[in-house]
Structure formats: structure tokens, C-alpha cells
């Protein structure tokens, strides 16, 4: 379970504090995949960053004993001067994957992303779609109790989207999804609750 306890997040503006959340309390139960929908600026992505530990609340806390992914598809954490292979190696070291486990994850991302020779070129030479494929594949290469997906289904062409959705469905057999999407079809196909 993930519990949000009195979660408060604000950002400074010229007119004072803009509160995204104020004393938000909510529980994401285990074994349930949840879809989050809302208008632009409602705080969905901010919530995902807080749950994933990429940002800290101004007050309150996120409580869990479960493993939680970073927001799937987030490519801003990748190093542009490194190749995709080197970025995968780096993340593997952070998560304790070495030896054959590391090689397995590298193969998974390389095969999943389908970017050919670019896999061994610096990410700064990639299109945004190619970076998204690497980031998405890297996120799926690791096992988590909860996967955070912030508009993750928007990555790539229809064939790649179908492939991504198949991996999501496979992951939900052993893990939970918290999915932010404007696509009601993705929410219906992948989530138990909205």
C-alpha cells in the first residue's frame, strides 16, 4: 500500500504560494491498478513525482514498504553524453544489478527500444521519441511493486504503443500501476479503478 498522509505541495508565484495539494490523504491499495485523470495543471504529474521520490512534499509524507518505480518514460534523468547502453549500465549499478543480471537488462532495453545502431551513440543525438523508447524500456527492465506511468502510453507509433501496452499488462500480473492519462481507452484497458 502507498499512503499519502497530509501531503502538501506548493510552488512560489509572484502572487504568493500556489498550492497543488493541501493536506491530501489517500491510500493506494495493493493489488489494484489505479488511473488518474484530471485537467492540465491539476497536479497529476507533481503527485507522480512525489510518490516516486523525485520531489519532496512541503508538508506530510508518502508512506510505503513497497518498491516504486520512477515515473515511467521520464527521460530527464538520462545523461545525454552517454550512450543508451551506458545509461542502462549506470541505472543497473544504482539498483544493484551486476554481471548477468545487468547484461539481461541491457539486452531487454536494446531489444525493446528497437533503435538499432543508435543504442551505442550518445543520447543527445536521439530524437525525443528515441529517448522515450529507451526510458520506457529501462523502466520496464526492473521489477517494482508499483509502476508510475505519467502519460507513458503516448510514447511512439501505434505498433510501439501496442508493444508497450502488452508489457504493462504483463507487469500488472505481479505489480500495480498508477497511470496518469488523458486516454480513457488506456485507463479502461489497464486500470481497476479511476
Across the structure, where does each feature detected by a protein language model lie?
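A short, flexible loop at the N-terminus of ABC-type nucleotide-binding domains that lies
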Residues: 1-4, 9-30, 35, 58
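ABC ATPase nucleotide-binding domain signature region
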Residues: 30-35, 39-93
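Conserved H-loop
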Residues: 73, 182-190
Amino acid at each position: 500500500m502507498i499512503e499519502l498522509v497530509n501531503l502538501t505541495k506548493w510552488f512560489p508565484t509572484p502572487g504568493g504560494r500556489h498550492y497543488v495539494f493541501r493536506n491530501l490523504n489517500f491510500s493506494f491499495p495493493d493489488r489494484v491498478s489505479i488511473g488518474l485523470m484530471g485537467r492540465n495543471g491539476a497536479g497529476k504529474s507533481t503527485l507522480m513525482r512525489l510518490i516516486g521520490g523525485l520531489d519532496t512534499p512541503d508538508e506530510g509524507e508518502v508512506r510505503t514498504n513497497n518498491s516504486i518505480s520512477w515515473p515511467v518514460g521520464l527521460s530527464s534523468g538520462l545523461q545525454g553524453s552517454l550512450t543508451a547502453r551506458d545509461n542502462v549500465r549506470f541505472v543497473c549499478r544504482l539498483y544493484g544489478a551486476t554481471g548477468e543480471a545487468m547484461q539481461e537488462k541491457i539486452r531487454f532495453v536494446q531489444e525493446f527500444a528497437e533503435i538499432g545502431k543508435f543504442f551505442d551513440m550518445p543520447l543527445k543525438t536521439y530524437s525525443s521519441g528515441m529517448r522515450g523508447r529507451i526510458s520506457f524500456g529501462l523502466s520496464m527492465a526492473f521489477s517494482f511493486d508499483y509502476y508510475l506511468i505519467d502519460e507513458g502510453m503516448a510514447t511512439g507509433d501505434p505498433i510501439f504503443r501496442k508493444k508497450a501496452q502488452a508489457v504493462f499488462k504483463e507487469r500488472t500480473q505481479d505489480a500495480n500501476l498508477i497511470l496518469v492519462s488523458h486516454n480513457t481507452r488506456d485507463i479502461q484497458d489497464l486500470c481497476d479503478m479511476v
